């Protein structure tokens, strides 16, 4: 019998969204950016490809400096990761001994629970109200690490800012604020890093910078925290192509800001259109919306959309079992989605 750790055997594992191997689907299920990065980011790639026999910069210096210029922090306060998921794992290894407590909301990014269980941590979930929002700060005195996403998936709304501030003030451990979707909103938490010595903000280039296939993320915090996290980072955790493309993307802020605004405009149109089609839809600060059809079971709608080559995300979580999550695509993709939904509604 294989000597598999108990915590691994008891963990079902993270279930990612479908990644079809054909191109005939409208893919609105994994919150990727519908717009490609500018062609110019590939200009110096050939030079890097010639160096693939060599290890990349182990600490991603150029990438961190480029990120620091955009984020407004010294590169010494930034840790680069293989996607922001890497940052979450590094934080666990840095701050939480097996058996110690990790806290997060009862409805949030499901990877938090998976990686905490695999780490052997004790899990404390914090309840949200009937609207999946906080009624109070996240108070968990025994938690060595609190994961909190804002905007928070799968709802897509920012958490109450004052409650987050009080969470950071009262926490005895580290608070990691996951800002994977923040560029599609008007709010960030950079000031929390300057105000509190126990805060990490994580960012990803998968959503807003159109680099989901490259896996580039960051942890931003005090120099002291980043120094400790760097000790447990995997060696060479970003390949040279990811480092190069990530750094290049930061040179095109005007372009990316324009597509963030495009996504926000399309998102608002999608919300209004779904409401007109008899959906209950939450407002969103992200590049997706959470919607509940009032005329069909969400699981059935998910299946019928998939049969018509439109992929959305359905979760079996009991609190959102009659919701689907829809990534904001291009206007043409959203038009097709709405067209199919109208057809299905007329047939129901």
UniProtKB/Swiss-Prot annotation:
Q: Which reaction does it catalyse?
A: L-histidinol phosphate + 2-oxoglutarate = 3-(imidazol-4-yl)-2-oxopropyl phosphate + L-glutamate
Q: Which PROSITE patterns match?
A: AA_TRANSFER_CLASS_2
Similarity annotation? Belongs to the class-II pyridoxal-phosphate-dependent aminotransferase family. Histidinol-phosphate aminotransferase subfamily.
Q: Which cofactor does it need?
A: pyridoxal 5'-phosphate
What is the annotated quaternary arrangement, including any partners?
A: Homodimer.
Species in which this protein is naturally found: Crocosphaera subtropica (strain ATCC 51142 / BH68)
Q: Which residues carry this modification: N6-(pyridoxal phosphate)lysine?
A: 207
The alphabetical list of record keywords is: Amino-acid biosynthesis, Aminotransferase, Histidine biosynthesis, Pyridoxal phosphate, Transferase
Q: Which domain of life is it from?
A: Bacteria
- Cite the EC number: 2.6.1.9
Which pathway does it take part in? Amino-acid biosynthesis; L-histidine biosynthesis; L-histidine from 5-phospho-alpha-D-ribose 1-diphosphate: step 7/9
Name this polypeptide is given: Histidinol-phosphate aminotransferase
Q: Which GO terms describe its molecular function?
A: histidinol-phosphate transaminase activity; pyridoxal phosphate binding
